[in-house]
């Protein structure tokens, strides 16, 4: 259930990032439309077609990489994210995509590197700090992970997943009272799994 909730959240926010970064101004290309509708194979085809005429458009590589990721083609996804970053090294979309991908592949040090780079870019979303927190947690640096989750919450007070992840980490650290406060906040924000976790750990 936790993995489903996390993936659903990432899908939603990364769709938003794709549409925010549309390469053709107000016009959304075929790949973006197909990705938004969950048609990932068609999205790959759409992005590939656009790349024939716009081979240096980092947004198209990022979008195709996200589509490959949703199809479980992680090698192809990483290659496209790397192409996007070669064209635009400070693009936080591609950095977040790489961080998320490395978390999925359990390459936590690499995930931390990309998340940290994204976090340092002005205007980067709270997701960068969340991914940094997840990587730090997996590496075994819980206090640093708590700080990263806290930064994510400072950037976005309505970030249910940040409260939820911080609560789970606090449970692991036996700080149940603090964890329950975070579960409550995640519940108010209707984050999936928060109510069940509150019932499990706080009653």
Question: What are the functions of these language-model segments?
Answer:
Residues 63, 70, 97, 131, ...:
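Canonical tetratricopeptide repeat
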Residues 172-203:
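Terminal, low-structured helical/coil segments at or just beyond the last alpha-helical repeat
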Residues 60, 94, 128, 162, ...:
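TPR alpha-solenoid repeat register
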């Amino acid at each position: 259930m936790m993995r489903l909730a996390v993936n659903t959240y990432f899908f939603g926010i990364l769709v938003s990032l794709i549409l925010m970064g549309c390469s053709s101004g107000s016009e959304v290309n075929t790949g973006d439309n197909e990705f938004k509708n969950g048609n990932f194979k068609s999205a790959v085809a759409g992005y590939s077609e656009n790349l024939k005429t716009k081979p240096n458009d980092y947004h198209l590589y990022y979008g195709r990489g996200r589509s490959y990721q949703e199809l479980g083609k992680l090698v192809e996804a990483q290659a496209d994210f790397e192409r996007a970053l070669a064209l635009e090294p400070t693009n936080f979309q591609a950095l977040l995509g790489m961080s998320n991908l490395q978390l999925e592949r359990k390459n936590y040090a690499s995930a931390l590197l990309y998340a940290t780079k994204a976090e340092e870019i002005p205007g980067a979303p709270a997701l960068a700090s969340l991914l940094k927190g997840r990587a730090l947690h997996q590496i075994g640096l819980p206090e640093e992970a708590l700080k990263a989750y806290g930064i994510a919450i400072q950037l976005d007070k309505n970030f249910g997943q940040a409260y939820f992840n911080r609560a789970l980490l606090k449970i692991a650290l036996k700080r149940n009272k603090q964890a329950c406060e975070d579960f409550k906040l995640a519940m108010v924000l209707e984050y999936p799994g928060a109510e069940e976790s509150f019932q499990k750990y706080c009653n």
